[in-house]
């Protein structure tokens, strides 16, 4: 049976050819290798029809033009040569589209990403809708790749090299008006007239390219180009720490095309694409992409979720305000905030106002839409308006008695079906539910700060939580734009449990004489977004260390912080950035203020600040403890699978994405090598480095995590 075509051709009475893109059976249009023959057959028909005046590419999908290439197609390549051949095939196809003698216009609505934007770039003109769903980008770098279908060559010539480099090196998304301003599209119109606007453009001569801004013209010349690539190369190296080879290859390929011409550029692009597909970094980044896609499809349990029409939040502090924002503005659900005083409610409302007003200032949102979203949030100092809320999220202080009181109040003031979700970071959910009359409707829902930026949430059912409560909470998290993982109700859950020994070891090295900035720089070089000491300052030293006694009580001395160090720091009123002094000192400009290490920290903790360890040695000590604890979490079924463990670490604490997560990283090193490193460290520094039993067994059998069956807690 012949597969239905993803590209269909219809010729209008006015001799404009409409090519409709609609991948059968898929929500998103993605480009597959087998589509090349379909497009070539259409191009042949276009060339043979001498009456045609123009061509328009348009999508039949309601919210996307083309969302990029099918990643599975790339993963099926066994060699760099196969991947290079794939790129050359795509390049040839784009060249054939561009070589058509009549105007070819892309009519863009929704996501136009990767290969979709490269197809649009091969057209002679582009029109897009003013809908918020319409975004244009080349995100291949986020998968450890570069655009392989002429994108590195066409984009710099269209919008200028410096602007193009920013897009290609970061995967930055452009909204419609930004794209128009930069010259990436020729017009922005309402969705209702998109096709007609594109047809009108196709009836004219090919759109003439806009003259580039003076700055871009200067940078396109040999001297300007040399200076630009030197500066961008330096900045990129600092940002990536040399851990992402794709960025280096992007710079090389773009510069080759500008210096030696498009033919050399296309050749360099295809070769670089093929080589990057085979790098371990790209394979790890693609594994994270697939894992996160799977997690987003996971319903959490087999039970159907209950309806979600409105949500209540207890506590208007930093977390409560952030949760209210994502619930109203991402999930689109009415939110009622309860706080014991009006100031707390005002704080939460201001939190959402600040987020939305920032979008209005950046022209990402209309003022009317801001007001519409804000209208979903209301506040109260009692339980008025809570009677029919489907789910209540508790975000009050980390105090067990207080949280148990909140459960009792919700059961008294809300409907019988209402779910109680606690945002605790450390308290057992079973204890919070201990006195509940409906314990099956109590669950943990652990957000990370700042709520609007951190993609992960941990969903923590206790032993008596119902399957429907799990499914409903997972459903809410997805509506909020989060990636949820379901974890077992054990001390520290998953993310904080693997993070604590990592931070403890950093503090221990401080007491041994390593310098603050050396420890942080070592872990940034390893691939973390910030070092462990800076992370503690950002979270708040008082907040970040609160969980250590809980973990020590549950799991023993391997979670012990260096004696008296934490108490010495807290007794000196050092909380981190939030009060201007921690391990670092901060200026008065809030989160953007510059920081510098406070030299007084060393005598305070009885350290010299004259280290002897190299950066790799520092990183090794912190990371190995994290890996060991992650393996224990699999063994104890704290996480349902190694997939969830990798996602949790990457999305929750910034474990280097190019390593694929703790379990992918162990597999890449080999369990035997990890065991050998840990045993060496145990001999040097103590029994906390002793490899756990599960890891030793895997090493003996030569097993790897991603080739064994994932465990399931249910």
UniProtKB/Swiss-Prot annotation:
Catalyzed reactions per annotation: a (3S)-3-hydroxyacyl-CoA = a (2E)-enoyl-CoA + H2O; a 4-saturated-(3S)-3-hydroxyacyl-CoA = a (3E)-enoyl-CoA + H2O; a (3S)-3-hydroxyacyl-CoA + NAD(+) = a 3-oxoacyl-CoA + NADH + H(+); (3S)-3-hydroxybutanoyl-CoA = (3R)-3-hydroxybutanoyl-CoA
E.C. numbers: 4.2.1.17, 5.1.2.3, 1.1.1.35
GO biological process: fatty acid beta-oxidation
Molecular-function annotations in GO: 3-hydroxybutyryl-CoA epimerase activity; enoyl-CoA hydratase activity; long-chain-3-hydroxyacyl-CoA dehydrogenase activity; NAD+ binding
Subunit composition and interactions: Heterotetramer of two alpha chains (FadJ) and two beta chains (FadI).
Name listed for the protein in its UniProt record: Fatty acid oxidation complex subunit alpha
UniProt source species: Shigella dysenteriae serotype 1 (strain Sd197)
Pathway: Lipid metabolism; fatty acid beta-oxidation
Stretches for region Enoyl-CoA hydratase: 1-190
PROSITE patterns: 3HCDH
Disulphides: none
Site (Important for catalytic activity): 118, 140
Keyword set includes Lipid metabolism: yes
């Amino acid at each position: 049976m012949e597969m239905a075509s993803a590209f269909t051709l219809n010729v209008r009475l006015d001799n404009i050819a409409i090519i409709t893109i609609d991948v059968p059976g898929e929500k998103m249009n993605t480009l597959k290798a087998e589509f090349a023959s379909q497009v070539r057959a259409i191009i042949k028909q276009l060339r043979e029809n001498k009456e045609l005046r123009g061509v328009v590419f348009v999508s039949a999908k309601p919210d996307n033009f083309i969302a990029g290439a099918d990643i599975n197609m790339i993963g099926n390549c066994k060699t760099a040569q196969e991947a290079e051949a794939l790129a050359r095939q795509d390049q040839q196809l784009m060249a054939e589209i561009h070589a058509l003698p009549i105007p070819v216009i892309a009519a863009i609505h929704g996501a136009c990403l990767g290969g979709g934007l490269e197809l649009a770039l091969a057209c002679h003109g582009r029109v897009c809708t003013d809908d918020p769903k319409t975004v244009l980008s080349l995100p291949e770098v986020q998968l450890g790749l570069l655009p392989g279908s002429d994108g590195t060559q066409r984009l710099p010539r269209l919008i200028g090299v410096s602007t193009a480099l920013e897009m290609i090196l970061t995967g930055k998304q452009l909204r419609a008006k930004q794209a128009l301003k930069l010259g990436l599209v020729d017009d922005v119109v309402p969705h209702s007239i998109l096709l007609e606007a594109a047809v009108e453009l196709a009836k004219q001569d090919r759109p003439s390219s806009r003259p580039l801004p003076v700055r871009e013209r200067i940078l396109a010349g040999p001297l300007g180009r040399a200076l630009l690539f030197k500066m961008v190369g330096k900045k990129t190296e600092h940002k990536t720490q040399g851990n992402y080879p794709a960025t280096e290859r992007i710079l090389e390929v773009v510069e080759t095309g500008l210096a030696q011409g498009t033919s050399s550029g296309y050749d360099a692009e295809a070769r670089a694409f093929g080589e990057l597909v085979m790098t371990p970094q790209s394979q790890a980044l693609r594994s994270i992409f697939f894992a996160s896609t799977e997690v987003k499809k996971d319903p959490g349990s087999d039970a159907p979720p209950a309806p979600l029409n409105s949500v209540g939040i207890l506590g208007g502090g930093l977390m409560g305000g952030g949760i209210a924002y994502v619930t109203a503005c991402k999930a689109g659900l009415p939110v009622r905030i309860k706080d014991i005083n009006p100031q707390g409610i005002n704080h939460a409302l201001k939190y959402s106002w600040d987020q939305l007003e920032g979008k209005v200032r950046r022209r990402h949102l209309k003022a009317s839409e801001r007001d519409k979203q804000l209208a979903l949030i209301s506040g109260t100092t009692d339980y008025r308006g809570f009677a029919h809320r489907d789910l209540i999220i508790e975000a009050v202080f980390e105090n067990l008695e207080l949280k148990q009181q909140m459960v009792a109040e919700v059961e008294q003031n809300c409907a019988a079906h209402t779910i109680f979700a606690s945002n605790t970071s450390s308290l057992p959910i079973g204890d919070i539910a201990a006195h509940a009359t409906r314990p099956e409707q109590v669950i943990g829902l652990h957000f990370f700060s700042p709520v609007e930026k951190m993609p992960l949430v941990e969903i923590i059912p206790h032993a008596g939580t119902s399957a429907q409560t799990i499914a409903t909470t997972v459903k809410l998290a997805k509506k909020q734009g989060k990636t949820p993982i379901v974890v077992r109700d054990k001390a520290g859950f998953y993310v904080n449990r693997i993070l604590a020994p990592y931070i403890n070891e950093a503090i221990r090295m401080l007491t041994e004489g390593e310098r603050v900035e050396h420890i942080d720089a070592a872990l940034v070089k390893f691939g973390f977004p910030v070092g462990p000491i800076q992370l503690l300052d950002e979270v708040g030293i008082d907040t970040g260390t609160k969980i250590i006694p809980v973990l020590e009580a549950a799991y023993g001395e391997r979670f012990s912080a260096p004696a008296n160090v934490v108490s010495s720091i807290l007794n000196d009123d050092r909380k981190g950035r939030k009060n201007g002094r921690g391990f670092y000192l901060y200026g008065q400009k809030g989160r953007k203020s510059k920081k510098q290490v406070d030299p007084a920290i060393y005598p305070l903790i009885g350290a010299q600040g004259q280290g002897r360890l190299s950066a790799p040695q520092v990183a090794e000590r912190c990371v190995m403890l994290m890996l060991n604890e992650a393996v224990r979490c699999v063994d104890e079924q704290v996480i349902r699978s190694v997939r969830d463990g990798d996602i949790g670490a990457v999305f929750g604490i910034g474990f280097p994405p190019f390593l694929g997560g703790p379990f992918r990283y162990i597999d890449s090193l080999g369990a035997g090598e990890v065991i050998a490193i840990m045993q060496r460290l145990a001999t040097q520094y103590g029994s906390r480095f002793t490899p756990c039993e599960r890891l030793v067994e895997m090493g003996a059998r030569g097993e790897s995590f991603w080739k064994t069956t994932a465990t399931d807690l249910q």
